[in-house]
């Protein structure tokens, strides 16, 4: 099936794309919703639906995958917040509808890759939009065990870094910019201590993917800055704002049986 992937830049939407490909689907385009540029604090939009931290790097993410990217500015708010969603003018869900409608028209997709794990709020709204557009939502991570998922993501070579922290035990100075594989033991510890969701499904943290097996090139962060959103003494909320990034060619590892003695000597 021809599939468009709804991406935030984070690990979940990336891993769900990998699951789509493993199931035989073809990712033909990427779709992303972003905050208005003129909005104060536009890096971090107060949205029930969308991750917006890291949105400045999404163009580079699409370039790394060598896929067309469709973007739309989030104009709506969280208006209909009930357990069942019905079409509601001025709701941010309608921005998703317009975005996916465009992608369907341009790319003739039949399915949408969605990285939702636990949020019924998100699932209900994505399903509503997909039903109205006659699209099949593909959510392979839905209600999976989060410890298993995190381990799988790391094992499958998703190179992601922490770009937002918002939980007890997560320190902006220590943890922002840290690779996910290095954070895994600590996240498991926080889960046991404080009930933190290890995949960040409670909004405890957010990530940005710099490389994965689907990328043709990898993203390098040249410079960034820490922005404090809320200086809470126990659970400060802060995020990483990317200032400069570039793409770099990926070097394929040389199999041992193809390496010369000189390669081995210099390794």
Swiss-Prot record:
Phosphotyrosine: residues bearing it: 97
Catalytic activity entry: diphthine-[translation elongation factor 2] + NH4(+) + ATP = diphthamide-[translation elongation factor 2] + AMP + diphosphate + H(+)
Lyase among the record's keywords?
A: no
* EC numbers: 6.3.1.14
Q: Which UniProt keywords apply?
A: ATP-binding, Ligase, Nucleotide-binding, Phosphoprotein
Q: What domain of life does the native source organism fall in?
A: Eukaryota
GO molecular function term, any single one = ATP binding
- Does the record carry Aminoacyl-tRNA synthetase as a key word? no
Q: Which GO terms describe its biological process?
A: protein histidyl modification to diphthamide
Q: Spell out the CDD domains in the cross-references.
A: AANH_PF0828-like (cd01994)
A Pfam family per the record: Diphthami_syn_2
Pathway as given in its UniProt record: Protein modification; peptidyl-diphthamide biosynthesis
**PANTHER family the record matches:** DIPHTHINE--AMMONIA LIGASE, DOMAIN OF UNKNOWN FUNCTION 71 DUF71 -CONTAINING PROTEIN
Q: What family is reported? A: Belongs to the Diphthine--ammonia ligase family.
Instruction: Describe the function of this protein.
Output: Amidase that catalyzes the last step of diphthamide biosynthesis using ammonium and ATP. Diphthamide biosynthesis consists in the conversion of an L-histidine residue in the translation elongation factor eEF-2 (EEF2) to diphthamide.
Q: What protein does this entry describe?
A: Diphthine--ammonia ligase
Please report the organism this UniProt entry assigns to the protein: Bos taurus (Bovine)
């Amino acid at each position: 099936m021809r599939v468009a992937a709804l991406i935030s830049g984070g690990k979940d939407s990336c891993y769900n794309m990998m699951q789509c490909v493993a199931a035989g689907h073809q990712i033909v385009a990427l779709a992303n919703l972003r905050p208005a540029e003129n909005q104060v604090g536009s890096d971090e939009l107060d949205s029930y639906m969308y991750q917006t931290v890291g949105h400045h790097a999404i163009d580079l993410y699409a370039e790394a995958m060598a896929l067309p990217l469709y973007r739309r500015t989030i104009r709506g708010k969280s208006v209909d917040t009930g357990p069942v969603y019905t079409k509601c003018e001025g709701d941010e869900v309608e921005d998703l509808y317009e975005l996916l409608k465009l992608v369907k028209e341009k790319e003739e997709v039949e399915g949408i890759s969605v990285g939702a794990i636990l949020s019924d709020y998100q699932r209900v709204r994505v399903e509503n939009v997909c039903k109205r557009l006659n699209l099949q939502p593909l959510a392979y991570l839905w209600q999976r065990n989060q410890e298993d998922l995190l381990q799988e993501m790391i094992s499958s070579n998703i190179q992601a870094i922490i770009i937002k922290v918002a939980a007890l035990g997560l320190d902006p100075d220590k943890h922002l910019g840290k690779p996910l594989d290095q954070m895994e033991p600590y996240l498991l510890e926080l889960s046991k201590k404080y009930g933190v969701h290890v995949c960040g499904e409670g909004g405890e943290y957010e990530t940005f993917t710099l490389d994965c097996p689907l990328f043709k090139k990898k993203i390098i962060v040249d410079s960034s800055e820490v922005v404090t959103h809320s200086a809470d003494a126990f659970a400060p909320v802060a995020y990483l704002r990317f200032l400069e990034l570039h793409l770099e060619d990926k070097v394929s590892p040389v199999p041992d049986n193809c390496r010369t003695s000189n390669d081995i000597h210099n390794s």
